[in-house]
Amino acid sequence: MGQKVNPIGFRTGVMVGWKSRWYASKQEFSGLLPEDKKIRDFIKRHPKKTQYRQAGIDKIEVERTRDEVKVVLHCARPGLIIGKKGQEIEFLQGELQNLIGRRVNLKIQEISRPELQAQLVAEEIAEQLAKRASFRRTMKRAMEQTMEAGAKGIKVQLAGRLGGAEMARREKQISGSIPLSTLRAKIDWGFAEAMTAQGHIGVQVWVNQGFYAMGDDKDGDDAEEGKASKKPARTYKR
């Protein structure tokens, strides 16, 4: 029976690059890896700046050199993080430096089409469910917007006490094609939780953004070079 592996993890290192890009010795690795998680959690769940949660942060990439830590935020509304004359981004950069005790170089990269990012779609659905919107209508609207934005397919799955029902259940809707086992397919995945009065509702979203072009793969460039040579054509002597 086929198992539902995480589409991003399945393609990482083959078609998709890593979100943390650095090298460390065995002694340093155990300290640096939790540091990356601390950076991501601090930005996404900032104790004071609630507007960061509205900025539509899709992913946070971390690169390390000997001198500094480079943090790249991919978000839909960069103005909420940059602030007036760049004051907010300087403040956040200072907070991150105090948090990890290293020099931080913070960069913001705007997402051109947030409707195609599965994490942002999942967070939008969760936000609507928390406002007690109809779950079926919310799913349908989100799927229509994603397909209109140019997606090849989308799948949305909700799990929990849907509509305030006494018994938790799972409901899913699919539009278009979602080839999860095809590595060339650009499948994005996102997860969010809706905090409702009846309990938590889990939201999972899969978005098919098309196929990777031949030069798009980040870490699979040498896969063709390492391929075994084909056997010579067999000849028959009379």
Language-model regions, residue ranges each:
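RNA-contacting regions in translation and RNA-metabolism proteins
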Residues: 1-238
